Amino acid sequence: MMLTSNSATEWWKMFQESIAKELSNTPSQRLWEAWGSRGRRTIFYTEDLLPPVARELGLEWETELLAVDYAMSLPISRVPLVFVEAENDIGNAYNEVRKLCCLSAPVRVLLTVGEWDATEGVWSHGGLRLTLLKTWQAIVEAHVKARPSASVLGVLVGEWCDALPARSDHRLRFYSYLIDANAALSTDQTEVLFERIIPSAGLI
């Protein structure tokens, strides 16, 4: 389902009609209680009013979906041009990708860490690159199909290897990828953005 300006207006009409219906079906006592305090009103929205609206629209109900870790904005106007989500648990980074896809800044960035290198012998499981990169790309593709956007998703993956094959030094890498506005993985860039071999000797 692709959203256009017309279909977005239709969604708004359905949303407001459902809100009106739920409010009409709410007893006066419950409305009075909800307006007793800010906290009660928030509970009313969260528990009574909005979940039934989501169900009627055939949508999944979620709370506190968007809270962005970092933003880089234009001076004065403070319009964000870059949003960054940092996730230390790479297995849960799909949530950050979903969140970033909901934002309209030109550049959205996932910054995460994990056992990434697919080179044989580096990681016993063979590295997470192929699996997770495809997963994140599929999330972007689903969003593009529903709501085309000119924004891109940058992916930065930090990787620390404690012991490389045949040596005891440490290696820190950052891998970089770009998933473009059509959800295609760009090949016009260097995969390894940064690499440093760090000798074990001298580290405290």
What is each stretch, according to the model?
Residues 52-64, 107-110, 138, 144:
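Charged, terminal alpha-helix-loop-beta segments
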Residues 1-64:
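Acidic-basic catalytic patches of nuclease active cores, encompassing PD-(D/E)XK
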Residues 59, 66-74:
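Long amphipathic alpha-helical segments with strong coiled-coil/leucine-zipper propensity
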Residues 138-204:
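Non-catalytic C-terminal interaction segments of nucleic acid-processing enzymes
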Residues 84, 109, 154-156:
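Hydrophobic/aromatic beta-strand patches that form the interior of the parallel beta-sheet core
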Residues 65-67, 79-81, 105:
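Short connector loops at helix/strand junctions that flank enzyme active sites
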